[in-house]
């Protein structure tokens, strides 16, 4: 089933010469981080274009890759001016659907993995660019060590269907090992086996790390129940997962990330920048965040420099 809305917006329309820009937004799944990125993207373009000069066709694939393909093919048939792929599968579907329409990704961890480009250097040379939501993995590993200096076993929990999640697991593992931890990855295929895999991971680990992962983000309630029962704390790769089941995260602002993506779209549509030469951008700021109640429950001593956020 397709979940779809179309809307127009009014604001400052300087520089548009009255042109109406039609933008298709394919969002992989509904959850806090991706929702914020979509909102930031739309807000930026609304502010810059406005006055009925931009129309968004926003559709949510509800976590289904095949639906992403259907949505993006519809965008291509409509000959939209630009497509936003929010989430890895959404970007991949857009990339497969058209070599011509400019495509921007957001909430993407690693574009080389997403686009299957082994020689990725930050510029696609094609009709694809965008923003990455990856907070520096070495800093994430260092933060976990800061909070759990006496832990021995770190488990990494992620969805095997998400290529970017495996990339994060593979990339952060050496940093954990360098910090003196024994590391094991635990992957679940989809939402149906989250609970079983999470239980095994909790039983065999002193602390879990969950990277930015859309399926995990949509199942934090299940993961939290398992981890709480097992008394296994979780460090998360992004704020939404942390609020749902974690104790701490090194987080970016997904609204800020979406606005950065919107700025790139504006530069393509209005300023005529060549997307084939545009570098993938990252969020400008990262923040150490923690959930006080959960940290207190586990007896975690949180050093200075962390910002408190509330659990959901």
Role assignments for model-derived ranges:
Residues 17-42, 48, 57-67, 213-218:
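Extracytoplasmic "Venus flytrap"
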Residues 16, 111-151, 252-273:
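Hydrophobic alpha-helical segments within soluble ligand-binding/sensing domains
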Residues 241-290:
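Flexible loop/turn connectors
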Residues 1-2:
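Short, small-residue-biased leader/transition segments that mark boundaries at the very start
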Residues 60-118, 213-237:
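Beta-alpha junction/loop-to-helix N-cap segments that form part of ligand/metal-binding clefts
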Residues 55-77, 187-201:
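Structural motif
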Residues 163-232, 238:
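Pocket-lining segment of extracytoplasmic ligand-binding domains
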Residues 23, 41, 129-176, 274, ...:
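An alpha-beta-alpha
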